[in-house]
Amino acid sequence: MDKEKSPAPPCGGLPPPSPSGRCSAFSEAGPIGHGSDANRMSHDISRMLDNPPKKIGHRRAHSEILTLPDDLSFDSDLGVVGNAADGASFSDETEEDLLSMYLDMDKFNSSATSSAQVGEPSGTAWKNETMMQTGTGSTSNPQNTVNSLGERPRIRHQHSQSMDGSMNINEMLMSGNEDDSAIDAKKSMSATKLAELALIDPKRAKRIWANRQSAARSKERKTRYIFELERKVQTLQTEATTLSAQLTLLQRDTNGLTVENNELKLRLQTMEQQVHLQDELNEALKEEIQHLKVLTGQVAPSALNYGSFGSNQQQFYSNNQSMQTILAAKQFQQLQIHSQKQQQQQQQQQQQHQQQQQQQQQYQFQQQQMQQLMQQRLQQQEQQNGVRLKPSQAQKEN
């Protein structure tokens, strides 16, 4: 059995070397005393079988064996269709992946250079090397291609990156404190690049265009909502101004009513005093009438009692004098009350005039403030309209 099989090449699939080859280097490189041992080892290695028979006994785990199976092929993972001798032909999926990879690397050269400086291999260089290795597989030995490909990991299908996931982690961390406008400027893509991407990857171009339209719609909704809120604020402010004016008018009316009420109270007091005076006068007149009746009815006996008549006259005159003094005092009181009323009326008129002046000044000040606010709002609206026209024009141009 061993004699029928041809001996395996000593150096891993290469033709038998000369005595000065690599496999005989043990005899030459070793010391002089150990030449026979080296020849014996080379002879034993040459007699080893390619597929030794399996022994029944303790079996090692597969993880300890470093041999590769014979049926292993990397052509399906790399997208190669056909045999290696027919030449490398890539599938449509790998072409689309390579084109998307090329576009991504054109857009983000800065991130690729930073990763290359750190020591990580870029995606394009790795794929180019694998393409060169698979392309030269038609002329070279398949075992060499397997060994060269085994050194690197497999190339798997790479999904196209979206606009949100195309940024590196470092860029995201650095741009975290920046405004939204800078991020939108980084993410935005020109119309020419969109046209090129539509030719290469129409699905991605449609997705980007739909995202832009949705963002524009959301911005329009926000602006409309802001306009509605501003209008509501303006209406509420106008209502507040009108209510404040009405309140000032009501305060004026209440002040006038309080003044009139005070005047009416003073008039009532004077009327009561006059009523008391008239009552006293009526009583005095009644007494005089009674005295006159007594005098007219007792003329005859008066001649007899002359002394009593003289005493009655003296009493009557004394009563008249007392009544006159009372009337004079009451008239003096009335004059004082009238003067006090006039003074109070003058003071009230002055106070009303001052209050009216103050209210007019306040009303003028409020009107000036309202005019200033309206001017500021008009300026803000003009600025916002100008800012809105610019992106709408840019969208139309796009």
Swiss-Prot record:
Compositionally biased intervals (Polar residues): 125-148
Start and end residues of each stretch annotated as Leucine-zipper: 229-264
Chief location category: nucleus
Keyword entries, A-Z: Activator, DNA-binding, Nucleus, Transcription, Transcription regulation
Alphabetized Pfam families for the sequence: bZIP_1
Functional description taken from the UniProt entry: Putative transcription factor with an activatory role.
Listed name of the protein: Probable transcription factor PosF21
Species name: Arabidopsis thaliana (Mouse-ear cress)
